């Protein structure tokens, strides 16, 4: 027997059926010790659920039921015990209910029993993942140091780890160790070849995987310690890089896997691994088969820490409104944490392009070496020096992800989110918000002696209103506007009014209990009541409010630690605590959505309706109190959690920014007194000037300090929307800067007219007109510009655009397709420039510039379209374009009709001189 402290990198679970003995359930935990030894801990666990029994049953009747049920469904009888828990569904005064905890040897046995018993009895918590269960039972963080108090040697090993032990889940616990874990990060990238000069396809015999580059860096260290490129065919040396040349393609992949094992890799990262590199390696491994024996020459099973089972194919589907349906293709690496930085950026950043080159340029000021695919193919066919150029290119593609990982604190972001919600890291990559919130709820419910019932759902009859938006008083305000915001409004409402599934009154017997104060709120779904907690003792607090209290406390602590780390110039810990506090904030804000979902683990739509109804009342009350506390003031707009106020101040204080800040803070403090804690109305900024277009659409200069210069703040306008071209955003930005900073509308009009004139005269480069959209799968409407362009790219190059990629396109003048839909006139910008194609100026004027520009100037001009687009400098040019378009369209239709009728045009009889 021994003790063990290690940092976990991967959690796995499985039912085990040994050759001898009973089947059992096991959790395999992989990780690394402080001295760099790899670990595999095999922890036995007995899955369980709770079952509610009738209150009328005697102890003898209950015991008989336990015995009979345990025998019938293969439960572990000595471990199946009666207990009492509170039901987390519907207020009943916190009554303890009789339950039985049924414990099973395997997860499959537990599930079979649950499905057979659920129609007769109320089952609780059968859907809790056993790994998540252990996190809460043993107070373990999924990605933090942990301790095994009793570990035993194994008879038969399942891993190649330095240390492999068996234990019971009861011997697992957290560790006090706070050191940076000695994790080895491997950033890797493959280079591929196509003999036919098309997009390389793994199933084509001659489309080899020609190089695999890997850069290794120890977590927390400033620089990599090893760079290696494994190459197919002899390759010359590259400075600072270890070159390994192989005679066979299979040797390239096998050597690479051996290097990963030798370096004891804990974290595997790259860019677009899950949609390209891993799929390609798997495809090529299937091609590398011994001609005589038929055996695989590539040993994918060597991936990861298990002796058997590495390299298995894992396909994941991820569906979202933003990206459509995406398929991810992984090769299993047991014990190794896998991160695809491309997917992290798609999920967390809103960018024009997600290419490694663009992302690196944006966040690092660095970029890839320029080596197009065709040159890679040519250099592979050349000599050793040519292939060395490919190796240098590949090495750079492994350095950039490591720099991005550190710069953006991506590993910290993922692991701290996993720790905050107590789910495996893998869930952060591939699961949504529901399972995160549910895990938090499971832990808090257990602490408070509640059980979460299975299959509970509120039948929605009617529709509740969303967040309040007070009528926007549109206009250009060249006076100061104070913005008052509620801090974390929805979580604060839930905490203040004790809203939780088990505090919601669903039974009239409990709606007027003596000595209990209730909060009552009317919604579109009906009127709901919630018993309030005792403010002095905390008695009666609901599970969800208690959970949110904890998360708020944890976030406050993390922000404090972050400030201390910043003070001590500890960048690593500052990033760590920043990731922590952001994780807690995200979880707090996701609880409302979790409860308001129509389907899920414990959907409770009345709570969501109650929260939004309460928020509406608070916004309306705030607007009323502003005019009472500061007569003559006006609320010009109210959104979900904020109000915009034109404060009435003495004439000599109107332009005094210090006085504006002082009065706004006083207003916020006075109104906060009207609301139940922890609701807090804060003052954070003054807008001056402020142009209000409609709800959720404004432009202003924001001041967060009376002595600062101020920053432009825009919401809802074309200026900040990706579906408009850069030229649109550029013109709008220039116009808006003049309006806001110079407060000079006439000059802004003049500058805008000149910009439009330059568009009409083709004075802007093509990239200013280039837009992009994410390519999805399964379009119902195939008349999409980016879809047409992606098809054109494939037809011309043989290189398919992968699903999930952003496809750039530009609309060009195309007389042949004037009578077709506009999307057919979309073109690949690179092709358009190489072939001297002209931008469709009329399209950009009418569909990209006219409406956004007129909308921008609407509060400032009587007739923006006439004053700008009717200006003598540009009106004639626009009219000429329209006239030419009509004539060309008429000719195109006539030509198409003649072709359809097999008729020659009269001009075909004339000879050109």
Swiss-Prot record:
InterPro entries: DNA-dir_DNA_pol_B, DNA-dir_DNA_pol_B_CS, DNA-dir_DNA_pol_B_exonuc, DNA-dir_DNA_pol_B_multi_dom, DNA/RNA_pol_sf, DNA_pol_B_thumb, DNA_pol_palm_dom_sf, DNA_pol_type-B. It catalyses: DNA(n) + a 2'-deoxyribonucleoside 5'-triphosphate = DNA(n+1) + diphosphate. Residues 182-401 are annotated as: Contains conserved residues essential for 3' -> 5' exonuclease activities. Its EC number is 2.7.7.7. GO terms for biological process: base-excision repair, gap-filling; DNA replication proofreading; nucleotide-excision repair, DNA gap filling; viral DNA genome replication. GO terms for molecular function: 3'-5'-DNA exonuclease activity; DNA binding; DNA-directed DNA polymerase activity; nucleotide binding. In addition to polymerase activity, this DNA polymerase potentially exhibits 3' to 5' exonuclease activity. Belongs to the DNA polymerase type-B family. This is DNA polymerase. It comes from Paramecium bursaria Chlorella virus NY2A. The lineage of its organism: Viruses, Varidnaviria, Bamfordvirae, Nucleocytoviricota, Megaviricetes. The gene is DPO.
